[in-house]
Amino acid sequence: MCFEPIEETTFHSLLFKDAKICHKCFLKFKPKINKFNIGNVKGLYLYNYDEQVQNTLYQFKGCFDYELAGVFFDYFRLYLFLKYFGYVMVPAPSAKEADEERGFNHVVEMFKSLKLKMNCCVHKTTNVKQSDLSAKERENIKNNLKIDDVDFSKKKVLIVDDVYTTGSTVRAMIDLVKSKNPKKIKVLVMSKTKDIHEGV
């Protein structure tokens, strides 16, 4: 981040008046809206999980820099709000101990900037961090998740997460949400690793 004052007379400053970073810094994330599929569920991601995104995300959730909560969505906010208007966001849970240490749930705070309804109904049953698990162990993440007794019938649900790597968390969440009979399910992730094949 350049930390330079944002020019208030530019086109971008007028169109994105609530942006926390300038357009030049935003472009360093190399934004690109890409579609992918998880089974028969449609997903969308905004960035490849490259070094710039990784470092900024670490500064936000690892260094507790709360002011960075909305920077990934600043210039996508209106588009995403209109695209997913009427959906209820269900954020991926993180370890309770990690949330308590940083003072906030990073996924919740990140996606809160979209101004869509949110239901934090999926929880981890253990405090194991996914980053500490092997790829094989991550595939069994569904055994560490549970969903509240919610009724999603006639509702459209948007599952949201920060990074899509193996996809195990998202797939487990899809199964949990499906058990609550939603009208439709879609997935939105901030970033996605390159080594995951589309459609899996």
Tell me what each language-model feature is.
Residues 1-200:
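Glycine-rich phosphate/pyrophosphate-handling loop used in enzymes and phosphotransfer proteins
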